[in-house]
Amino acid sequence: MSTVTEDSANGNRIAPENPVAAPTQPIQPPPEPMSPARAAIYMASSLLLFLTQGLGMNLLNANIYQLQGSLSATTSEIAWLSAAYIAPYASMSIALFKIRMQYGLRRFAELSIVCFVLASVLNIFVSDLHSATVVRFLSGMAAAPLSTLGFLYMLEAFPAARKLSVGLSLALMNTTLSAPIARIISPPLMDLGGWHALYTFEMGLALMALPVVYLLPLTPPPRANVIQKMDILSYLLLAIGFGCLAVFLTLGRLYWWFEVPWLGVLLAGSIAALTLMVVLELPRKMPLIDLRWVFSRENMHMAGILLLFRVVSSEQTTTAANFYMQLGLINDQTQTMYTIILLASIAGGLVCTVLMLTRYVETAHVLALVLIACGAFLDSQSTSLTRPEQMYLSQAMVAAGAAMFLPPVMSKGFATALAKGAPFLVNFLVIFLFTQSIGALVAQAALGTFVTLREKFHSNVLVEHILLTNPFVAQRVSQLSGSYGKVITDKSLLNAEGLQLLGQQVTREANVLAYNDAFLVISVASAIGLVLLLGHLTWRRFVPHTAAAPAVATPS
């Protein structure tokens, strides 16, 4: 097995500490700098690839309630589509990295986009929930390479000195755009044809991306024999572990954690598969994943930061979106707000890009946490009368903060992995995928469970005061039942209808209070993260010998 390779983004040779073999083909000379026009085309191609992959996932999440009628399914059953998509997606990039190194970048790119187009075409044959679940599983497998290609096309547009600063920052900004765009374009698509319009649009994007990959080549790294037989078994165990865990986290809150036995089976299967993978990997001299390096102190610190990002960024992607649905707001009523979120994400990404070119890189983290903490706190003051107009400022703050948070961490982690050698990028991918894919599901499941528990708590507190002996309660019941007075003459039935309507209002208010609690928790988590970050920066300033490596580094 060879561990001598080349950075796939810029063609620079990377030599780890203990190389064991030479690549199977000569090293390519560094590419000539691109003209501004050609670089702009590569950047636009990167955006297209990110949108193709991201909209394929987010269009479903944005229309989960509208699709129940199209597929004749309940909310819990529709959630299987998200679980089927994320199960293979969570681990696929790890295998694809080694496949790309062994069989060549060009072949990898062309085959990847063809597979995604075929997966998109399969949507034509979807007729019910079962066929949709199978197609979503295949789409999740086919979509994993597109995010990799999106990164590579963005990095290709910049010289080596700017790849891990400007290139990486813009690429990560592109990953945040598909969620608000999905909410913006969903209403006209659903009006055109429901489920069929959504998958037709997805297929159209895939067909647009197809000629891009064939006409715009990437700098090919040298191929090397990096796949061993044990790598296949280790990856299968990792895929099973991540896949079972993804399904467990996606569906656990909906079916409830302790109510159905198969959730426990999924969790046990995930733990068993990952444990067996660890047992197989630890004794290997050249493992698929260097677990000792992955669990080093520096990487655990980075993983903690990435997990914090997933928790605080879920304020917008999950908690706020569910809050709107709880208030009965549909995508048509939130289009303007998501347009503002989109613009704020772009602004935050561009500001972070500028900061990445200076020595004030850590300022991006500080600004991001301040914006998210303040935005989430403003959202925690919501009521049942709150509408999108009252949340424009807070959601724009959260969007800008989320776009600024990730690039400095990713740049530092990328540079650290490259300093150890290109094979360590696989280990870095494990950390990134676990914290972003599985971490996002953990954040969604934890916050969703928290909202459910707090709703029950607030309901019990509110119901304690619903007594007909209270004249205000009796008056409210009479007012609510008045609309039925012309069709129901029985006084007892009329009061029962009034109590039912009052109970619905109590449940609505309890849900609003529960979401306010969740927003407040996110705000407090962001504030705690900010305090820890400022303490860490102060420590580094006054104790120079403990300072970490520079946040932005480029391979030599």
Question: Predicted segments — roles?
Answer:
Residues 82-98, 147-152, 339-352:
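Central cavity-lining transmembrane alpha-helices of secondary-active solute carriers
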Residues 187-305, 309-312, 316:
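Hydrophobic transmembrane-helix bundles of small-molecule transporters
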Residues 37-96, 131, 146-147, 317-321:
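Extracytoplasmic
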Residues 431-556:
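Hydrophobic transmembrane architecture of multi-pass small-molecule transporters
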Residues 93-233:
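Helix-loop-helix hairpins in multi-pass membrane proteins, especially solute transporters
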Residues 39-54, 61-62, 75, 286-456:
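12-transmembrane solute porter fold
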Residues 1-55, 69:
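Cytosolic juxtamembrane N-terminal segment immediately preceding the first transmembrane helix
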Residues 67-69, 99-100, 132, 185-194, ...:
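Interfacial helix-cap and linker-helix signal at transmembrane-aqueous boundaries
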